[in-house]
């Protein structure tokens, strides 16, 4: 795909010839992580064998292992890390038999995964996307300048290809790696929830709710950050791609742009898919809890309640109860189709009104309202228009009314602030706390 890429047979042959292998039991992995942490605290990044022996002694204490022949065992562990290319050993006649050790790129990569890649926050993602946006912006400006001045291939490699490949692509890879770590984190939370459900039910349900809500919130926050920047990044990549269309000598840039577009699409797509999968898991856990309680009405739970009542004066407790409002319970698993024939006439206020009729009425009204703005060249403050119009409709229709108003408004014009990258403030549009985030439409 890119110039430096290798085929699968080439990579297989390369790894086979060098006899690459990794074998890191828990003790060896902990030893490597301890070396990495110690190495980060040193300015020169160099370690003596005595340093490594001391580190090994500390790790063995954590495993409560014997310290007999510690020097020999430490030397064996060091030799294993050197053999697996996790450590580099340097020695010469000037060191008088004292070797110097440095972590290899592989050692740094393995330890970095366990130490520094565990945190994936919206703030970190925002910073990464901000850096990417700046780099792509500079590259697109350079690309347009290169077209105007008919610059040489050297100019394109230095000002367009290099920042995209060595900055933007690496940050995309970092975000992709962080998403994979989030996948692993979700799996660990699932294991924790499964363990909780085998313990005390009152504490388990509360803890499960907290874990489910925290994970859902984190996934949604991160995906919102990605969605906000994704379209703008794709637009900048398309600017660069337009500049190299028809230029056979710049094929390497076109290939790189295609690669970056695919990576960005994959990141955003998987983020949304992860949210959908987690929502499904969330529903599954809640359904499991409800089913377990329903099936256990006359067994374990009732017996626990009897024992608690019997021992109330020795161990007082609070009784928490919950009753679902059945008439407004719209969960999919509790909806039942009814085929009973309805007889008689409904009161006028309960007469059925089709959604298409409602849609046509609202569209006609909103068109008349919004066209007046365009004819007078008045800006449309969507939040204000929504707030005023929703007051005329019952709460059950607010979603459809809001969707129709927004759909009609964006057909009339656009907001200049959309192009500036400024995020609009959230504005409350009804008494139930619904909010909308929209720029003022000021260009028709």
From Swiss-Prot:
Chief location of this protein within or outside the cell: cytoplasm
Coiled coil location: none
Pfam families according to UniProt: KicB (PF03882), MukF_C (PF17193), MukF_M (PF17192)
Subcellular location: Cytoplasm, Nucleoid
An individual GO BP term: chromosome segregation
A GO MF label: calcium ion binding
Xref: Gene3D superfamilies: Chromosome partition protein MukF, middle domain, MukF, C-terminal domain, Winged helix-like DNA-binding domain superfamily/Winged helix DNA-binding domain
Signal peptide, first to last residue: none
SUPFAM superfamilies: MukF C-terminal domain-like, Winged helix' DNA-binding domain
Single GO cellular component term: cytoplasm
Keywords annotated in UniProt: Calcium, Cell cycle, Cell division, Chromosome partition, Cytoplasm, DNA condensation
Ranges for region Leucine-zipper: 212-240
InterPro entries: Chromosome_partition_MukF (IPR005582), MukF_C (IPR033441), MukF_C_sf (IPR038198), MukF_M (IPR033440), MukF_M_sp (IPR036141), MukF_WHTH (IPR033439), WH-like_DNA-bd_sf (IPR036388), WH_DNA-bd_sf (IPR036390)
Family, per entry: Belongs to the MukF family.
Function: Involved in chromosome condensation, segregation and cell cycle progression. May participate in facilitating chromosome segregation by condensation DNA from both sides of a centrally located replisome during cell division. Not required for mini-F plasmid partitioning. Probably acts via its interaction with MukB and MukE. Overexpression results in anucleate cells. It has a calcium binding activity.
Subunit structure of this chain's protein: Interacts, and probably forms a ternary complex, with MukE and MukB via its C-terminal region. The complex formation is stimulated by calcium or magnesium. It is required for an interaction between MukE and MukB.
Name the UniProt record assigns to this protein: Chromosome partition protein MukF
Lineage: Bacteria, Pseudomonadati, Pseudomonadota, Gammaproteobacteria, Pasteurellales
């Amino acid at each position: 795909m890119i110039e430096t890429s290798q085929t699968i047979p080439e990579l297989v042959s390369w790894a086979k010839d060098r006899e690459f292998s990794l074998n890191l039991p828990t003790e060896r992995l902990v030893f490597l992580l301890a070396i990495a942490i110690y190495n980060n605290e040193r300015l020169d990044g160099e370690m003596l064998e005595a340093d490594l022996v001391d580190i090994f002694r500390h790790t063995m204490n954590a495993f409560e292992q014997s310290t007999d022949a510690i020097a020999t065992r430490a030397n064996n562990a060091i030799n294993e890390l050197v053999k697996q290319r996790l450590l580099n050993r340097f020695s010469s006649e000037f060191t008088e038999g004292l070797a110097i050790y440095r972590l290899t790129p592989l050692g740094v990569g393995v330890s970095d995964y366990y130490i520094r890649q565990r945190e994936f926050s919206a703030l970190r993602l925002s910073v990464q996307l901000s850096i990417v946006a700046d780099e792509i912006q500079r590259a697109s400006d350079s690309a347009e300048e290169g077209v105007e001045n008919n610059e040489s291939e050297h100019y394109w490699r230095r000002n367009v290809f290099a920042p995209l490949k060595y900055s933007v692509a690496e940050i995309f890879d970092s975000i992709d790696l962080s998403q994979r770590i989030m996948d692993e984190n979700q799996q660990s939370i699932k294991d924790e929830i499964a363990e909780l459900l085998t313990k005390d039910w009152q504490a388990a349900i509360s803890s499960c709710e907290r874990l489910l809500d925290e994970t859902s919130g984190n996934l949604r926050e991160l995906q919102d950050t990605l969605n906000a920047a994704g379209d703008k990044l794709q637009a900048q990549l398309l600017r660069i791609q337009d500049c190299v269309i028809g230029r056979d000598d710049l094929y390497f840039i076109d290939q790189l742009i295609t690669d970056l577009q695919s990576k960005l699409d994959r990141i955003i797509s998987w983020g949304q898919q992860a949210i959908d999968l987690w929502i499904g898991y969330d529903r599954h856990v809640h359904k499991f809890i409800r089913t377990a309680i329903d099936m256990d009405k006359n067994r374990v739970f009732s017996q626990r309640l009897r024992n608690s009542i019997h021992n109330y004066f020795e161990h007082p407790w609070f009784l928490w109860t919950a009753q679902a409002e059945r008439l407004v319970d719209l969960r999919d698993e509790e909806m039942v189709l009814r085929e009973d024939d309805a007889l008689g006439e409904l009161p006028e206020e309960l007469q059925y009104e089709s959604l298409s009729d409602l849609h046509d009425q609202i569209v006609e009204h909103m068109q008349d309202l919004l066209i007046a703005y365009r004819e007078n060249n008045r800006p449309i403050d969507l939040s204000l228009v929504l707030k005023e119009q929703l007051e005329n409709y019952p709460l059950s229709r607010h979603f459809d009314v809001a969707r129709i108003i927004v759909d009609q408004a964006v057909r009339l014009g656009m907001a200049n602030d959309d192009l500036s990258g400024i995020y609009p403030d959230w504005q409350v549009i009804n008494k139930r706390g619904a909010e909308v985030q929209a720029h003022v439409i000021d260009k028709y």
